[in-house]
Amino acid sequence: MLKAPIGLLGGTFDPIHIGHLRPAIDARDALGLAEIRLIPNHIPPHKANPFCSSEQRLAMVRLAAAENPGFVVDERELKRDKPSYTIDTLMALREELPDTPLCFLMGMDSLLTLPSWHRWQALLDYAHLVVSVRPGWQPDYPTKVAELLARHHTTDATALHRRLAGHIWLADNLPIALSATRLRELLAAGQDPRYLLPASVADYIRQQGLYQAD
């Protein structure tokens, strides 16, 4: 018998904010996920180097997890000295959790660029994909992504409990137009980040003097 599925949310988290956390909370509640694992990247393959150090980003992720029941921090990617490829993390987790469905959480922007990911066609061998979709948005799917959805999309949340991997579930979420880039701009301008990220994270940023304008 399979255990309850868990959610996996990777990212640079520079800093972690409600645009990361709110969709994860929604997915946890909609799918009955046993936990959400926050997995900070060390060297993100598709992004520029982070503004903050790994230690600072980890500290912020720990603070955010402490404020959200059922959220835990997985540090494995920070301990690598090579790019943080999702497939490597999923393969390691599958070996550790052979009876637990894995739900990898991502935004629609990530799904649309999935064919550029390292070994992207193998991801669904190890996890389900849970994709945050802005209500009313009808994306123009690239051919490879459209074909992937045709084979793997489900609207049955319980299906993610019955199989270890292989489904794609599109989650309707509250529209949150916030990116880490925009948040860093607000912080650099000295604006109040209240309600855009956990209070403990905002306090840490202020105490450490992070994201200030040069």
UniProtKB/Swiss-Prot annotation:
Keywords: ATP-binding, NAD, Nucleotide-binding, Nucleotidyltransferase, Pyridine nucleotide biosynthesis, Transferase
Catalytic activity: nicotinate beta-D-ribonucleotide + ATP + H(+) = deamido-NAD(+) + diphosphate
E.C. number(s) listed in UniProt: 2.7.7.18
Pfam families: CTP_transf_like
MF GO annotations: ATP binding; nicotinate-nucleotide adenylyltransferase activity
Top-level EC class as recorded in UniProt: transferase
Record InterPro entries: Cyt_trans-like, NadD/NMNAT, Rossmann-like_a/b/a_fold
Membrane-spanning residues: none
Pathway: Cofactor biosynthesis; NAD(+) biosynthesis; deamido-NAD(+) from nicotinate D-ribonucleotide: step 1/1
GO biological process entries: NAD biosynthetic process
Function: Catalyzes the reversible adenylation of nicotinate mononucleotide (NaMN) to nicotinic acid adenine dinucleotide (NaAD).
Family: Belongs to the NadD family.
Protein name: Probable nicotinate-nucleotide adenylyltransferase
Protein's organism: Aeromonas salmonicida (strain A449)
